[in-house]
Every structure is written in structure tokens, then in C-alpha cells.
């Protein structure tokens, strides 16, 4: 059974995540005091029910040791996973402005900007031990819920899920990436007027990139690097490995290479997911 602990800065989407987990059959509790985690887990263990609990700045323990003690006292039947949601500062400010809600730390007479910054410091102990960090800055409510459904329902127990994610550097580097590879030096289909409207998922773009030796060399050396360290990553008790591939716009080169790497590791029996940030953003 899974005990999913959902945390993150206020406004990053914890309530949305909890509702999505409830739809997936998790028993969900919002803002449960950390010290009660073992009691909740023992109660649910007999019923064979996976649980999801949100922890935010309002119910953070006074010291990280209290959280560690609670985790150590969980029944063996539960496999704890920590999901940390985040968004960039400007996005959080905009979301609070849109909803006109008060920040949990506003009672300390802090400005919204100062409250967001202080909350980040207070939640750092949880962020640092998270199994999965998700940047929701560019996600809608529905995209966040769908992403969680895809990642959690697609994950096999005790198996590392490899996520290959394409992005454009001009849109920013994904904060949930474990590895970032820059492919802006590779031949660019953008300069071919016929290929410019297409994406790295289209066959003519794939054929263009496939003709270049440096593209093959990059893919080979990148997958060799990942294969070298994958056994150690798999034994490091982590649930996800996110590999981000970036080009200028996130439309051609990064998409093609992310798909090539995903197909390679999928063909070798790995649990693989692929995501294309720029292409997904264009659909909305």
C-alpha cells in the first residue's frame, strides 16, 4: 500500500492533487498533523487502503526530526512517497491575486511576497527529501490532475519510472528535472521553411535529424551515460528519474531526442513516460 504525502507551497495545487488522488481510490486527509501519520496508517493497514495526506506550512512540525520519527514509525505495509508541488514566485503571486485568498502566513503581518519566501524556507526539509517535485507554473488544474494520474497509475511498485521531458530554454528549465541536457548545438530543422511548422514527432523532422551523425552520437552517449548510472539510481529508493532535453523552442530537436531515448529504454523493459512541455502548452 502507498502512503502519498503531498506538500508544497500554498497556491501550487495541493488541493487539486489531493482531489485527483481521491479519484484514484486513495483515502485522503487534508492537513493532518505529522505526529498522527503512524496512527492513520495503522488504522488503514487492516483495511488495505492506500492513503494520501497533505502537509503544508500550517502543520509542519517544529523540527525535521519529528517528521523523520513519524516516517520511521509507519507500518511496514505502507510504502511512503513524498510529492512536492511548487511554482515560480510570480505564478504564486498571480494565483493569490486571482483568488483573493489570504496566504497562511499572512497573520504574521507579512507581505504576500515575504510570506511566499518564508514559506519556501520552512518547507525546505520536505522539499529536500521529496520523491517527486512537480512544477505547476504552466499547468492548468486539469493538466495537473492528468499528470498525476498518468505518473501514479503508470508506476509499477518498487520500480523506477524514467520520465523523458522536452522543453525550450526560452521558456525556462523544468525544476523537476534530475538531469538537463542541452541540444541547441545540433542541426536545427527550424531553418528549413518546410519543417518549421512541424514538430519532432513528425516523420520529416525525424528524417532530417536522423541524417546527421552528431545527432546519433549525442543519443548514443546520453543513453550510455544513463545506462551506466541507472543501476545505482534504481537502488537509491527513488521513484522517478526525470531527464529533461532542451533546445531553443522545445519544438523540434528536444522532442525528437526525448522520444528516441524514451523508445530505447522502453524497448529494454524500463517503465518509461515521455512529456513535451512546449507542445502540451500549445494545445491549451
UniProtKB/Swiss-Prot annotation:
Residues 266-284 are annotated as: RNA-binding. Keywords: ATP-binding, GTP-binding, Nucleotide-binding, RNA-binding. Coiled coil: none annotated. InterPro entries: P-loop_NTPase, RapZ-like, RapZ-like_N, RapZ_C. ATP binds at residues 8-15. One of its GO terms (molecular function) is RNA binding. GTP binds at residues 56-59. It comes from the Bacteria. Modulates the synthesis of GlmS, by affecting the processing and stability of the regulatory small RNA GlmZ. When glucosamine-6-phosphate (GlcN6P) concentrations are high in the cell, RapZ binds GlmZ and targets it to cleavage by RNase E. Consequently, GlmZ is inactivated and unable to activate GlmS synthesis. Under low GlcN6P concentrations, RapZ is sequestered and inactivated by an other regulatory small RNA, GlmY, preventing GlmZ degradation and leading to synthesis of GlmS. Homotrimer. Belongs to the RapZ-like family. RapZ subfamily. This is RNase adapter protein RapZ. It comes from Citrobacter koseri (strain ATCC BAA-895 / CDC 4225-83 / SGSC4696).
Amino acid at each position: 500500500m502507498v502512503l502519498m504525502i503531498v506538500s508544497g507551497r500554498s497556491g501550487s495545487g495541493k488541493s487539486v492533487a489531493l482531489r485527483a488522488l481521491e479519484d484514484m481510490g486513495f483515502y485522503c486527509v487534508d492537513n493532518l498533523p505529522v505526529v498522527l501519520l503512524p496512527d492513520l496508517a495503522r488504522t488503514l493497514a487492516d483495511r488495505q487502503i492506500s492513503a494520501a495526506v497533505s502537509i503544508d506550512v500550517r502543520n509542519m512540525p517544529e523540527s525535521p526530526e519529528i517528521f523523520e520519527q513519524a516516517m520511521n514509525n509507519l507500518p511496514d505495509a505502507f510504502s511512503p512517497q513524498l510529492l512536492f508541488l511548487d511554482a515560480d514566485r510570480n505564478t504564486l503571486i498571480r494565483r493569490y491575486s486571482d483568488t483573493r485568498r489570504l496566504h497562511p502566513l499572512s497573520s504574521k503581518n507579512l507581505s504576500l511576497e515575504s510570506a511566499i519566501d518564508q514559506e519556501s524556507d520552512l518547507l525546505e526539509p520536505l522539499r529536500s527529501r521529496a520523491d517527486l517535485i512537480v512544477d505547476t507554473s504552466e499547468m492548468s488544474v486539469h493538466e495537473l490532475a492528468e499528470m498525476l494520474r498518468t505518473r501514479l497509475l503508470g508506476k509499477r511498485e518498487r520500480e523506477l519510472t524514467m520520465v523523458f521531458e522536452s522543453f525550450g530554454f526560452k521558456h525556462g528549465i523544468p525544476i523537476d528535472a534530475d538531469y538537463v541536457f542541452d541540444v541547441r548545438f545540433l542541426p536545427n530543422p527550424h531553418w528549413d521553411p518546410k519543417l518549421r511548422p512541424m514538430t519532432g514527432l513528425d516523420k520529416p523532422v525525424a528524417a532530417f535529424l536522423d541524417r546527421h551523425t552528431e545527432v546519433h552520437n549525442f543519443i548514443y552517449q546520453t543513453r550510455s551515460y544513463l545506462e551506466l548510472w541507472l543501476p545505482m539510481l534504481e537502488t537509491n529508493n527513488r521513484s522517478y528519474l526525470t531527464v529533461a532535453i532542451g533546445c531553443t523552442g522545445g519544438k523540434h530537436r528536444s522532442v525528437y531526442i526525448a522520444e528516441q531515448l524514451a523508445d530505447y529504454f522502453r524497448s529494454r523493459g524500463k517503465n518509461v513516460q515521455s512529456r513535451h512541455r512546449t507542445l502540451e502548452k500549445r494545445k491549451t
